[in-house]
Amino acid sequence: VQDPKVIRELADEVGLIICATHEPSHKILEEPLEVVERLNILGCKHTAFPHPGSYAIDSMEACLVLANKLESAGKILRDGGKQLSYHNHELEFVRYANKSILELILTNTDSKFLQAELDTFWVQKGGEDPVEWCRKMKGRLPLLHLKDYVVTLEREILFGEVGTGSLNWDAIIREADEAGCEWFIVEQDTSTRDSFESIKMSFDFLMQKAEAQNQ
C-alpha cells in the first residue's frame, strides 16, 4: 500500500500512530514539498533519508555536496512543520580524513534541519559502538531504529529480535533516552521466526526494560 490516505485509514482503524517514515531519497532532495504533503496526510512529523542511493558519497567532497542538499531539503521540511533525519547503514562508517561519512554529513549540517535516526545494528556492523553514537547524538536523536546483532556459531551475522543478540541494550536505551530520543522503533528486516512472534519478542523485551527502569 502506497497511498497515504489508505495507510492513514488503516492506522486509525487499529489505533496506531505513524511516528516516522522513510521516503525515497530523490523525493526528499528534489521534491520536499511533496514529502511535506504526504506527511500531513499521514499525520506524521518525522521522515528520514533512507539511503544515499544514486547520490555519490565516494569522497569527502561528494559527502559535503550531499550534506548541502540534505540541509536545503531539511529547511523546507521544517518550514512545513516536519523534521528530516538521516538513517544510517554500515556504508556511512567509511572514513575520509579520519571522519566517517555520517560524521561529515552531520557536522556539516545544522541540527535544526537534519537530525539522526541511528540504526543500532548497522552502527555495529559498520565497526562502531551504538552506545557511543547515541551519546554523541544528544539533542539530535529523535528516532532510534532497534534491531539486535546476532552472530551464529558459524560466524554468520543475522538481524535479531531486540535482546537476542550481542548489543548492550541497557546502555543503548539509557544513552538514547538521555539524548532525548522520542521514538524507539523496532525495525527487523528479516527473521527466522514468524514476523508477529518476532515483533512481540522485541516489544516484550523493551516493555520489561521500561518497567524495570520505572521501579
Regions found by a protein language model. Name each.
Residues V1, H26, P52, Y149, ...:
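Flexible loop residues that form catalytic
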Residues G43, Y96-L118, W122-Q215:
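Histidine-acidic metal/acid-base catalytic patches
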Residues D3-K5, V65, N168-W169:
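Aromatic- and glycine-enriched glycan-recognition loops and surfaces
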Residues V6-I7, E34-V35, E132-K136:
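A short acidic, amphipathic alpha-helical/loop segment
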Residues V1-A11:
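Glycine-rich, proline-tolerant flexible connector loops at the mouths of alpha/beta enzymes
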Residues E13, I17, T21, S25-A116, ...:
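Active-site acidic/histidine proton-transfer and metal-coordination neighborhood
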